[in-house]
Regions:
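Acidic, serine/threonine- and proline-rich intrinsically disordered appendage/tail regions
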Residues: 2-4, 29, 93-102, 107-110, ...
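N-terminal signal-anchor transmembrane alpha helix of single-pass membrane proteins
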Residues: 1-35
Length: 179
């Protein structure tokens, strides 16, 4: 009986090692979100009480296998304790495929190809009903872009952070920051 268990264990070890060798030879997907190279933010819309901004981030598959981006979302990092003048709404969407429900539909990235993801940020005035007046006191706005991706390996979650500075926001809103 011990002999059979030993044989089964050796077979499992050999299969595991063989799988590792195959993955190394065949390769895998390497997903690279190039957040640090995002396009400059632009104004999509400005109203009395809000401003909508967007930027585009390239996501490249630099590996040898197809990758799946299963989810991508934006987490704004502006607590009310730091600045309570605006409510921040942020989302990610595949370029050219806008969705009203804020759902990010899974997308394949073939080997050695890339896609563009649009990051949309809306700043809504919470107090004065005048976004330009409120933004004169705005602080830097960190944004975490989180994506879940998979290929031959088990799924992974990756996060990149970009910062929308108060100076950028002031320039886009055509205002001057308060001292």
């Amino acid at each position: 009986m011990d002999f059979i268990i030993t044989i089964i264990l050796w077979i499992l070890i050999i299969l595991f090692l063989l799988n590792e060798v195959i993955i190394r030879v065949v390769g895998d997907a390497i997903v690279n979100m190039k957040a640090s190279e995002h396009t400059p933010f632009t104004v999509d819309e400005i109203t009395q009480d809000s401003i909508s901004l967007s930027t585009t981030i390239n996501v490249a598959n630099e590996g040898k296998q197809c990758a799946t981006i299963m989810d991508c979302y934006v987490r704004q990092l502006l607590p009310y304790e730091q600045f309570d003048g605006v409510k921040v709404e942020a989302k990610a969407e595949l370029k050219g495929v806008p969705r009203e429900d804020d759902y990010f539909e899974a997308v394949l990235i073939q080997k050695k190809e890339s896609i563009d993801i649009v990051i949309r940020v809306k700043l809504i005035d919470r107090k004065n009903n005048d976004i330009k007046q409120t933004l004169t006191h705005m602080v830097d706005l960190p944004l975490d872009i989180v994506n879940q991706h998979a290929a031959r390996y088990p799924w992974k979650i990756s996060k990149e952070t970009i910062v929308l500075t108060s100076e950028e926001i002031a320039k886009l809103a055509d205002i001057k920051l308060a001292d």
